[in-house]
Regions:
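Amphipathic alpha-helical interface segments
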Residues: 3-78, 85-92, 99-100
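Hydrophobic alpha-helical segments
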Residues: 73, 77-81, 107, 127
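Long, repeat-rich segments with strong aromatic
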Residues: 108-114, 132
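Short metal-binding segments enriched for Cys and/or His
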Residues: 129-138
Length: 139
C-alpha cells in the first residue's frame, strides 16, 4: 500500500485514455499531481487547477480513468513483490515530513505518539491557503 500511495501522490494522473470506448468524455483530459492519496484532496486539487466543476462529466471521467490507472499500478506492484520476494524495495522513499513528524508522532513510548499512518503530512498541515499551519511554532 505504501508504494501505491507514494506513486499516486507523485504521478500526474489520469494516464489512461480509453479513446472511443469512453462512456463519458472522449479524448484526452487534463492530469495533475495530487500530492495526496485522499480522494477529496486529489479531486478538489484537480478541479481547481483545471477550472473544472466538481459536478462535471469531466470530473466523473477523471475518476473512472484514475481508477484504471491505480488498478494497473497495484497489479504491477503485486507482481514485483511476488517476483522479488524479500528483496523487494520500495521505489519511493518515505517523505521528509513523515520522517520528521514521525520522530514524535509515530514513535512508541513518546508522549505525542498518537499519529497513525504514513501519508505525507504537508498536504493537510503545511499552512497553505486552505489548511492550518501545524509546522508553525512547532518543534
Amino acid at each position: 500500500v505504501n508504494e501505491l500511495f507514494r506513486w499516486y501522490e507523485t504521478t500526474a494522473l489520469p494516464i489512461y485514455n480509453p479513446g472511443e470506448a469512453a462512456r463519458g468524455v472522449k479524448g484526452k483530459i487534463p492530469s495533475n499531481v495530487a500530492d495526496s492519496p485522499l480522494c477529496h484532496l486529489s479531486v478538489s486539487k484537480w478541479c481547481f487547477e483545471n477550472k473544472i466543476e466538481a459536478t462535471s462529466k469531466e470530473r466523473s471521467e477523471r475518476c473512472g480513468r484514475l481508477t484504471a490507472d491505480v488498478c494497473k499500478k497495484a497489479v504491477e506492484i503485486l507482481n514485483r513483490k511476488i517476483e522479488e520476494g524479500n528483496a523487494f524495495k520500495c521505489a519511493y522513499p518515505m517523505q521528509k515530513s513523515v520522517s520528521y513528524c514521525g520522530e514524535c508522532h509515530l514513535t512508541k513510548g513518546n508522549e505525542a505518539n498518537w499519529g497513525k499512518g504514513i501519508m505525507d503530512c504537508t498536504p493537510c498541515h503545511s499552512g497553505g491557503p486552505a489548511v492550518s499551519d501545524k509546522f508553525k511554532d512547532h518543534p
